[in-house]
């Protein structure tokens, strides 16, 4: 009892090889704390590993592995048979080269490739399909003669355009015309008054510049000649003098134009070219929006009403240039 059958020599050799590999593997795998930080092996572990690997390589080179013991290290065939390498003699190598050269020379030439032709467009004829044999039916069908478009076209009556911009432009042009007429009338009267005052100052001494009609009994405050208010008898005489001065200016201008007809044409052309260039440069700086133009004109008018005489002259010239450029632009 308790006796076991005797193990054969092969079994003992396998068990001995496994014990040897277990001992070698134990020396290869470090145990315990590796270092103080637990990351790197010590020098003793490295030396044990190097010594064990040298012993394993020596045993593998000598073929001393026992049968079946190689599976512990993943070696399925510890002593593989070497594959015999072919040995070529110089004569055999020369013969192989000559045979390959003759093959290249006797090889048939490559055939030239033909470019692929584009496929002919396929078109269905009435005789190709029995459903389309009766061509007259297709030609006489109303849908064949007048095919409907893929997208239906809906015809709508044209909408009448609203004339709001034209109405606004007409009102704006009327306001601008009234404004220009007002400014021109004021400036013409101012120029005529200055000429009248200069005429009176030449014909009357400086001490007698008071109006002679203010002592006729009317309750009028003292004033100078040429500045007669409404109600003074000299008011009509003042505007009569202004009218006479205006007629004289027109007569002088007409005489100059009549005497220098050709010169006036040349001067007119030169002046018109310079004025057109000035107006074109000013119109390029004007805003295109009509509301902005109205705001600009009324802003200049406000400055003109609340400023001195010198500023009024400059603003008036600016307004006239702006309005003229606006008409030139339109």
UniProtKB/Swiss-Prot annotation:
Asked if Glycoprotein is a keyword of the record, the answer is yes
Q: Which residues lie on this side of the membrane: Cytoplasmic?
A: 2-238, 187-238, 314-330
Q: Where in the cell is it found?
A: Virion membrane
Q: Where is this region: Pre-S?
A: 2-163
Query: Looking at the UniProt record for this protein, which Gene Ontology cellular component terms does it annotate, in alphabetical order?
Result: membrane; viral envelope; virion membrane
Instruction: Give the keywords, sorted.
Output: Fusion of virus membrane with host membrane, Glycoprotein, Host-virus interaction, Lipoprotein, Membrane, Myristate, Phosphoprotein, Transmembrane, Transmembrane helix, Viral attachment to host cell, Viral envelope protein, Viral penetration into host cytoplasm, Virion, Virus entry into host cell
Q: Where is this site: Cleavage?
A: 240-241
GO BP terms: namely:
membrane fusion involved in viral entry into host cell; symbiont entry into host cell; virion attachment to host cell
**Bias regions of kind Polar residues — which residues?**
76-88
Q: Kindly name one Pfam family recorded for this protein.
A: vMSA
**Post-translational events:** Myristoylation contributes importantly to DHBV infectivity. It is most likely required for an early step of the life cycle involving the entry or uncoating of virus particles.
Q: Where is the lipid attached (N-myristoyl glycine)?
A: 2
Q: Note whether Lipoprotein occurs among the keywords.
A: yes
Entry-linked InterPro entries? HBV_HBSAG (IPR000349)
Q: Which domain of life is it from?
A: Viruses
Residues exposed to the Extracellular side:
2-165, 260-292
Family membership, please give it: Belongs to the avihepadnavirus major surface antigen family.
Q: Describe the task this protein carries out.
A: The large envelope protein exists in two topological conformations, one which is termed 'external' or Le-HBsAg and the other 'internal' or Li-HBsAg. In its external conformation the protein attaches the virus to cell receptors and thereby initiating infection. This interaction determines the species specificity and liver tropism. The large envelope protein probably also assumes fusion between virion and host membranes. In its internal conformation the protein plays a role in virion morphogenesis and mediates the contact with the nucleocapsid like a matrix protein.
- Subunit structure, as described in the record: Large internal envelope protein interacts with capsid protein.
Which named protein is this? Large envelope protein
What is the organism of origin for this protein? Duck hepatitis B virus (isolate brown Shanghai duck S5) (DHBV)
Q: Gene encoding this polypeptide? A: S
